[in-house]
């Protein structure tokens, strides 16, 4: 039986020719030219930003300057471990009033390391994030003391700043607390209103508390607070049944209403760790300044541990809401060189390392859709300066 060509052969051949023509035109770039000529709006607009390039591309070609000619601005939110920073800089200033504090000339960084540095206090973590994002050249800061979980949550929005962790400042050992009124235990938080500032370390702590109690995020009604410092007020005013915030604030509020503190970071002393991060452009341009800051903070931390009085006075002036400043320092003491070595895996052992803490916080915030995908922990730290100081000081 002879084969006969059906009516579909010619359309099939035509489709083959069109397909081959499309592939050829695509390879030769004709399609892109036609799109650019007749449909220019359809071409994707690509936004370039400083984060697309290495942070140090604008550093001087010749010898790098030791320190900047202007003051180095280090941002922080008040907590016990900030006592070392205050002692190193002689006090605190603000972006609204950048005048050097009265004791700046007596700060350890000035007297021991000939470096002009200022500690800039912020009322909220979100304000600190914005200041780090823009940098000191544009009304922000060069460095910032922030918790590791905050860095994990903020890193996508700080891409252009290219922040790098350079040292451990301290850990919370009771500074964060969850207090409640009419709630006898953690399991009884189910169905209650939980007030917390979502951009602070207290939020991360509250998530850990829920996991410890076997509760889901949907088991409580979240009340978003404008700042960590609003936690005590929210509990007093009855806007929340429980709040997470600073011990000195929430413990007093709970006691005033017959409530109690249900949990603190003393139950998880390796959960909230404050680290010093430097903008990538600053660290690349002034590597010696980073080393001097690390030395100064370690020296100041040692002085605080030996005699907390002077640092406690400075802390009390800056943050009276922390309560007794000496107790605030005890619940979040400045980190030592040994703490830094263990935390970053340089020597010794730590129950939780920087990499573990960053990766777990990053995974958690992605899980609850609080942040985008972040780079691995090793890409967020620069330990060159810390290693230099560590080797110089010996075992």
Q: What are the roles of these predicted feature ranges?
A:
Residues 16-28:
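Hydrophobic alpha-helical membrane-insertion segments, chiefly the h-region
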Residues 31-218, 222-225, 241-247, 262-264, ...:
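Short, glycine-/small- and polar/acidic-enriched structural segments
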Residues 149-150, 223, 229-323:
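Pocket-lining segment of extracytoplasmic ligand-binding domains
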Residues 48, 56, 359-395:
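Conserved C-terminal helix/tail region of periplasmic/extracytoplasmic solute-binding proteins
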Residues 63, 183-187, 218-219, 284, ...:
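Proline/Glycine/Serine-rich low-complexity intrinsically disordered segments
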Residues 26, 111, 211, 255, ...:
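Short polybasic/polar patches that bind polyanions
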Residues 286-371:
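Secondary-structure end/capping motifs
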Residues 1-17:
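N-terminal Sec-pathway targeting helices
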């Amino acid at each position: 039986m002879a084969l006969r060509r059906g009516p579909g052969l010619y359309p099939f051949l035509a489709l083959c020719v069109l397909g081959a023509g499309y592939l050829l035109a695509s390879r030769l770039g004709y399609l892109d030219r036609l799109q650019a000529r007749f449909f220019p709006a359809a071409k994707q607009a690509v936004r370039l930003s400083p984060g697309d390039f290495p942070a140090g591309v604008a550093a001087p070609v010749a010898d790098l300057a030791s320190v900047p000619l202007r003051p180095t601005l280090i941002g922080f939110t008040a907590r016990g471990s900030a006592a070392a920073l205050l002692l190193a800089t002689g006090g605190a200033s603000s972006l609204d009033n950048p005048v050097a504090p009265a004791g700046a000339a007596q700060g350890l960084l000035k007297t021991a390391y000939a470096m002009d540095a200022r500690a800039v206090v912020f009322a909220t973590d979100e304000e600190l994030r914005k200041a780090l994002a823009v940098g000191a050249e544009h009304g922000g800061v060069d460095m910032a003391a922030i918790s590791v979980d905050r860095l994990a949550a903020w890193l996508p929005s700080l891409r252009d700043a290219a922040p790098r962790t350079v040292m451990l400042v301290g850990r919370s050992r009771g500074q964060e607390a969850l207090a409640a009124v009419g709630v006898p235990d953690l399991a009884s938080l189910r169905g209650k209103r939980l007030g917390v500032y979502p951009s602070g370390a207290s939020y991360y702590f509250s998530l850990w508390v829920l996991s410890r109690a076997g509760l889901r995020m949907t088991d409580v009604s979240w009340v978003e607070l404008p700042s960590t410092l609003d936690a005590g007020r929210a509990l007093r005013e009855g806007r929340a049944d429980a709040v997470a915030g600073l011990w000195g604030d929430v413990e007093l509020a709970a006691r005033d209403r017959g409530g109690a503190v249900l949990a603190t970071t003393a139950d998880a002393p390796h959960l909230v760790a404050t680290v010093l991060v430097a903008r990538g452009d600053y660290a690349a341009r002034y590597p010696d300044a980073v080393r001097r800051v690390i030395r100064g903070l370690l020296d100041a931390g040692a002085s605080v541990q030996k005699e907390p009085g002077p640092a406690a006075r400075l802390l009390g002036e800056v943050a009276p809401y922390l309560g007794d400043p000496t107790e605030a320092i005890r619940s979040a003491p400045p980190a030592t060189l040994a703490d830094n070595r263990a935390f970053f895996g340089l020597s010794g052992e730590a129950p939780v390392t920087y990499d573990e803490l960053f990766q777990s916080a990053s995974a958690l915030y992605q899980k609850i859709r609080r942040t985008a995908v972040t780079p691995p922990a090793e890409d967020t730290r620069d330990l060159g300066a810390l290693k230099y100081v560590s080797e110089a000081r010996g075992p």
